[in-house]
Amino acid sequence: MIWIVGGTSDTRSLLDKLSEKINLNNVIVSVTTEYGEKLLNDYNIKVIQKVLDKNKILDFIDKTNLNTIIDTSHPYAENISKNILEVIKSKNIKYFRYEREVTETIFDERFESLKD
């Protein structure tokens, strides 16, 4: 079983790629918002919509026959990634971080107010 920690458009990109290779019946995706869950309605997968703290992560892992975690959570959502890594230290579960390349934003002009 594969657990995808969702939360970005990368989640859907990954699901599209995975669906070409494996049966998505063996995939569970977790998201924290109803909107995130709604975005996954087109996929034939189990979606869990809730905030997972360490205890909930441990409980989820213990109740699920996981062998792989793919973390596609938002880069600023550091707690979920950190908590997962702490929980799986003593487990035989593979962990992968799936993250798009960060692009640098350059501003040409700055404004003091909207009137400018």
Where are these regions (language model features)?
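N-terminal glycine-rich anion-binding loop in soluble enzyme alpha/beta folds
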Residues: G6-Y43
